[in-house]
UniProtKB/Swiss-Prot annotation:
Keyword Nucleus recorded: yes
Cited SUPFAM superfamilies: RBP11-like subunits of RNA polymerase (SSF55257)
Protein name as catalogued: DNA-directed RNA polymerases I and III subunit RPAC2
Role of this protein: DNA-dependent RNA polymerase catalyzes the transcription of DNA into RNA using the four ribonucleoside triphosphates as substrates. Common component of RNA polymerases I and III which synthesize ribosomal RNA precursors and short non-coding RNAs including 5S rRNA, snRNAs, tRNAs and miRNAs, respectively.
Molecular functions per Gene Ontology: DNA binding; DNA-directed RNA polymerase activity; protein dimerization activity
Protein family: Belongs to the archaeal Rpo11/eukaryotic RPB11/RPC19 RNA polymerase subunit family.
GO terms for biological process, alphabetical: transcription by RNA polymerase III; transcription elongation by RNA polymerase I
Gene that produces this protein: POLR1D
Length: 133
């Protein structure tokens, strides 16, 4: 029972509210009755292949993860089902959180490099304009 409360506490930080004042969960954790915490399906609402495949890749880099895959429920629905199965004693929510954090770090790195390249380009363009006068 304490493990379930701890697991719920960990994923509660990942839940968000949607617009229009209506509270809607962006993330659900689905576990079949009688299964353990090592094999869990996460339902991510308002997401598609962009997040699904990137997150699956990041999670599969973890050696403790035995399986990670995702499906889109239907082309007209914007939600994905992400299934994670771990080896040993690691609960599935751990590599899920780690994968999200690592993916955010990669995205931040790409953004930083992109902004630095834009700045370099603008600086080079400005120096060329100054040298022509």
């Amino acid at each position: 029972m304490e493990e379930d409360q701890e697991l719920e506490r960990k994923i509660s930080g990942l839940k968000t509210s949607m617009a229009e004042g209506e509270r809607k969960t962006a993330l659900e954790m689905v576990q079949a009755a009688g299964t353990d915490r090592h094999c869990v399906t996460f339902v991510l609402h308002e997401e598609d292949h962009t997040l699904g495949n990137s997150l699956r890749y990041m999670i599969m880099k973890n050696p403790e993860v035995e399986f990670c895959g995702y499906t889109t429920t239907h082309p007209s629905e914007s939600k994905i089902n992400l299934r994670i199965q771990t080896r040993g004693t690691l609960p599935a929510v751990e590599p899920f959180q780690r994968g999200l954090n690592e993916l955010m770090n990669v995205c931040q790195h790409v953004l930083d490099k992109f902004e630095a390249s834009i700045k370099d380009y603008k600086d080079q363009k400005a120096s060329r304009n100054e040298s022509t006068f």
